[in-house]
């Protein structure tokens, strides 16, 4: 009499199959986790570069509209100095044109006093409501970029670059802005000043 053996998996075969499945699942999970981490890092980098680009757009818009007009009571057309105006590095201040006032609806000029400074590792844009700020008038502060460890300026005039600007009677012809930004490094940009001589 022949006996029919039952066919099936042995305990050892089942354990081996479970171990292989667990190893494959763990590998797939680690790959997925790595992809998600890389995606998150890429998103952070894109966000940082977008913030950096936005800061340079503000600088370009302001430098492109510089006009040679000092504020009342001050003879300086253009102010740039280190460790002034509560800045941890360079600060800069000037008059710009082109502040939008559609059809003159708002009770203000199209001229605006603006400035930039580095404070608490943040690049800040300073703007004033009045063309000639009153004594004690606080600027409107807009944080353009965070985690900035350096804000450096150089000035171009008469065919050469200068590390400081002491000429109170005219504007530079160009400005180089260098920022040292966390997760990005040092970034420099050159800006052409359209009005290099007083009109």
Curated annotation (Swiss-Prot):
Which cysteines pair up through disulfides? They are none
A Gene Ontology CC term for this entry? type II protein secretion system complex
Q: Which residues carry this modification: N-methylphenylalanine?
A: 9
> Biological process GO terms, please?
protein secretion by the type II secretion system
Q: Which residues form the propeptide?
A: 1-8
Could you say what a knockout of this gene produces? Deletion mutant shows longer pili but their number is reduced.
Q: What InterPro entries does UniProt report for this protein, alphabetically?
A: N_methyl_site (IPR012902), Pilin-like (IPR045584), T2SS_protein-GspJ (IPR010055), T2SS_protein_J (IPR051621)
The record's principal subcellular location, in a coarse class, is membrane
Q: Which keywords label this protein?
A: Cell inner membrane, Cell membrane, Membrane, Methylation, Transmembrane, Transmembrane helix
Q: How does it sit in the membrane?
A: Single-pass membrane protein
Compartments it resides in: Cell inner membrane
Q: Which sequence ranges are marked TM in the entry?
A: 9-29
Q: Name one Pfam family in it.
A: T2SSJ
PTM (free text): Cleaved by prepilin peptidase. Methylated by prepilin peptidase at the amino group of the N-terminal phenylalanine once the leader sequence is cleaved by prepilin peptidase.
SUPFAM superfamilies, per this entry? Pili subunits (SSF54523)
Q: Which domain of life is it from?
A: Bacteria
Described purpose of this protein according to its UniProt entry? Component of the type II secretion system required for the energy-dependent secretion of extracellular factors such as proteases and toxins from the periplasm. Part of the pseudopilus tip complex that is critical for the recognition and binding of secretion substrates.
Q: Which family does it belong to?
A: Belongs to the GSP J family.
User: PANTHER family, alphabetically?
Assistant: TYPE II SECRETION SYSTEM PROTEIN J, TYPE II SECRETION SYSTEM PROTEIN J-RELATED
Instruction: Note the subunit structure.
Output: Type II secretion is composed of four main components: the outer membrane complex, the inner membrane complex, the cytoplasmic secretion ATPase and the periplasm-spanning pseudopilus. Interacts with core component PulG.
Q: What is this protein called?
A: Type II secretion system protein J
């Amino acid at each position: 009499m022949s006996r029919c053996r039952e066919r099936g998996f042995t305990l050892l075969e089942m354990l081996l199959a479970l171990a292989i499945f667990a190893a494959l699942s763990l590998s797939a999970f680690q790959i997925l986790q790595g992809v998600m981490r890389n995606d998150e890092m890429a998103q952070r980098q894109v966000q940082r570069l977008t913030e950096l680009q936005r800061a340079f757009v503000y600088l370009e818009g302001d430098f492109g509209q510089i006009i040679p007009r000092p504020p009342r009571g001050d003879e300086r057309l253009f102010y740039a100095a280190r460790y002034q105006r509560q800045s941890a590095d360079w600060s800069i201040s000037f008059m710009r044109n082109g502040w939008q006032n559609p059809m003159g609806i708002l009770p203000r000029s199209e001229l605006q006093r603006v400035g930039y400074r580095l404070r608490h590792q943040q690049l800040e844009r300073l703007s004033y409501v009045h063309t000639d700020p009153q004594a004690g008038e606080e600027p409107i502060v807009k944080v353009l970029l965070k985690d900035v460890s350096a804000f450096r300026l150089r000035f171009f005039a008469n065919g050469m670059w200068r590390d400081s600007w002491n000429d109170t009677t005219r504007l530079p012809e160009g400005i180089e802005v260098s920022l040292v930004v966390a997760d990005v490094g040092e970034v420099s940009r050159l800006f052409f000043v359209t009005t290099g001589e007083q009109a």
